[in-house]
Regions:
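Non-catalytic, conserved peripheral segments adjacent to functional cores
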Residues: 1-60, 73, 77-78, 85, ...
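Glycine-rich nucleotide phosphate-binding loop and flanking beta-alpha elements
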Residues: 70
């Protein structure tokens, strides 16, 4: 899967609640601030986020295991991100957690974020836990 984003665009935090996907993420062009949130309820790092800067210059890639929500923001004018996923897309089980959730407290390096309507309407981390993990 390939994704294109412009500077200041934030996508996420996305997860499939059924057949959760592991993702291998790389940047072909540009630079992104990539975030993964651990949603595995029995994990020692449950509710914690991990962030990485991925770019065409540093050539870093990351693997995000199943059970993590994923999001990123574009840091350059044009950003091309490629994913290799461990499961097929399951649109019926796609969910989103607010990128700016107060509990998660992710410090996005963007002053004026551009966010899709879908992601603006995402639920809080607390509501996600209540609805899908308890």
């Amino acid at each position: 899967v390939m994704s294109y984003s412009k500077k200041n665009v934030i996508r996420g935090l996305h997860i499939q609640t059924k057949k959760s996907q592991g993702k291998f993420v790389s940047v072909l062009k540009g630079k992104v601030y990539d975030v993964a949130v651990d949603l595995r309820k029995n994990s020692k790092t449950f509710g914690k986020f991990f962030s990485y800067v991925l770019s065409e210059k540093n050539s870093h890639s990351i693997y995000i295991p199943p059970g993590f929500a994923h999001g990123f923001c574009g840091l350059e004018k044009e950003n091309y991100i490629i994913y290799s996923c461990t499961q097929y897309r399951n649109a019926a089980s796609e969910r989103a957690i607010k990128y700016n959730d107060k509990k998660l407290n992710i410090k996005w390096p963007v002053k004026k974020p551009v966010v899709s309507k879908k992601d603006q309407n995402a639920i809080t981390f607390f509501k996600f836990k209540e609805k899908y993990l308890l």
